[in-house]
Every structure is written in C-alpha cells, then in structure tokens.
Amino acid sequence: IKVVKNSIAQIAPHYTMKRQLDDYYSKFYCKLAKRFQTLAANDNAKAKEIAAWKEDVVAKWDSIEIVSCDKVEELKNGDIESGKEYTITYVIDEKGLNDAVGLELVTTYTTADGKQHVYSVEPFSVIKKEGDLYTFQVVHSLSNAGSFKVSYRMFPKNPDLPHRQDFC
C-alpha cells in the first residue's frame, strides 16, 4: 500500500487535464487542422486530386503484372540460413500508375498455439524504372534461427496520403 500511495503521489500530479488537452492538440488537433487546410485550399483541389488518383488506382490495380522475380534457390525451396543475406528482385508492370505501388517482404513465425505473428517487414527499394516497368529490390537476412514464412505484400502508395489505410 505504501508503494501504491507513493506512486500516486509522485506520478498523479504530472497527469492533469491540461496536459491531456495539450497532448490532444499537439498530437491530433493541430495536425488534422493543417491537413484540412491543405485539402480544402483552392476549392478542394488537393482532395479532388487524391480522389482521382484513388479512382485511377482502383481501375488499374487488377491489371498490374509481375514481369519477373529473381531470387536464389534457397529462397525458392525455403532453405534460408540465419545470418546470410539474400537479394530478391521483382520487376512489376504498374500499367501507367506512375510509381503508385509499394512492395514489402513480410516474415512471419508461428507460435506453439498455432497463431501466426509478424517477425519483420522490410520495404523493397525501387532501383530502376523503364516506362511502366519498376524494378524493386531488397536484401533480406534473418538474424535468428527458427521456422519462418516469407511472403510479399504489394500496396498502393502516394506521398499525399498520411497513412496507408487512408486509401479506403
């Protein structure tokens, strides 16, 4: 009880309603107000531009093609050594989306209760662009031994979206 009372006496004065409001303003309200001003400027020009971009991505998304995938046999067979670096390269035809695609390597592991968890997410870098063909590359290395699954995630990207979930 003495420890609890001491903790309340030492910590509680720092968590006031004023602090909560200050945190809210600095973390949320001010950022949202600035974003609104950007989107609403010039008769909502930026908002209309983003909406048109989203419609374009939706219209072309299913036509995106993976032209080639270059990875070593160990990755194809699932025999990855801990500590060894593997280079993975994908060439993707974005079908006119103009650098609107991002690619990630997602590594997962399964716990004893059968649940799958994300171990790491590594973004691919665009190393080359020829027309609509974008070459993505990542150097992948696992630092721990164990049983892992590797998959790839493709997603729409735009510097005007503050979060990936804003695409919806």
Give each language-model segment a name:
Residues I1-G102, T108, N158-L161:
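C-terminal amphipathic helix plus adjacent low-complexity
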Residues S82, N144-A145:
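Surface-exposed loops/turns
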Residues I88, L103, F136-V138, V150:
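Hydrophobic residues positioned within well-ordered beta-strands of beta-sheet architectures
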Residues K115-E130:
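Solvent-exposed serine/threonine-rich low-complexity stretches and specific carbohydrate-binding patches
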Residues K128-V138:
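Aromatic sugar-binding surface patches on proteins
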Residues H140, N158-C168:
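Short beta-strand elements
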Residues A145-K157:
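Short, aromatic- and glycine-rich surface loops/edge beta-strands on solvent-exposed regions
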